[in-house]
Amino acid sequence: MTTQADDSSIKPARPYAGKSAQERQNARRLALVDAAVRLFGEQGFSAVSIDMICAEAALTKRYFYEAFASREALLTAAYESVTREYFQAILVKMTPHMADAPKLVRAGLKETFGFVRRNPVKARLMMVEAMNVRGQLGDMYGARYDDFVELLLQVTRPLLGRQAPSDKVFRVMAKAVVGALIHLCQNWIATDFAQPVDELVEGTERLFAGVGRELGVRGYN
């Protein structure tokens, strides 16, 4: 004789320490990402094992594989976390100056170098280690680079003069400027931040000003 299961016996996972099962799972995932940012940024992706990440996060391997299929998947999540934090930081500083190109550029540059200096481990992951592990990051690296280029295009377009180039040429110019800024940050990190921030900001401001005059950006002509 078969009996029908009583629906009342099927209970959701009970809260533990005031947190639901999903909240605890999210917290474990975040702990793994934070651990990966620290270790990948300090030691490099190739030198860090899953065991090291779990030890840093104070979690077992069971919880690693609950959240990520592989070390490469965690690398992608760590890189995305840091780049998202950086973009949010520069947008906060740039947003009040969207109608004033020189102030907009200065705010963005000061926060870029400021973010790198305040967060050297995150900056190494985002600016240096990411270059070394582009193969493991897959499309993520190119996508975030393109996001940076697109941000520059979006904030510049409303300020363009009549002699603006075609969109394709404009995009090449934006990629060149972004590439120069990333390379400068990489060199700054490699020299242990030897050059003062004010000099970096002034030098890159002049670069942006030259591009701005070429484009006829209001405030530079």
Describe the role of every protein-language-model region.
Residues 1-27, 216-221:
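N-terminal intrinsically disordered/low-complexity leader segments
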Residues 31, 35-43, 85, 89-93, ...:
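Solvent-exposed, amphipathic alpha-helical segments
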Residues 31, 39-73, 77:
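Helix-turn-helix
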Residues 77, 92-121, 201:
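Hydrophobic alpha-helical connector segments
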Residues 84, 88, 135-161, 171-183, ...:
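Amphipathic alpha-helical packing segments from all-alpha helical-bundle domains
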Residues 93-97, 126-130, 159, 188-192:
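Secondary-structure edge/capping motif, primarily at the C-terminal ends of alpha-helices
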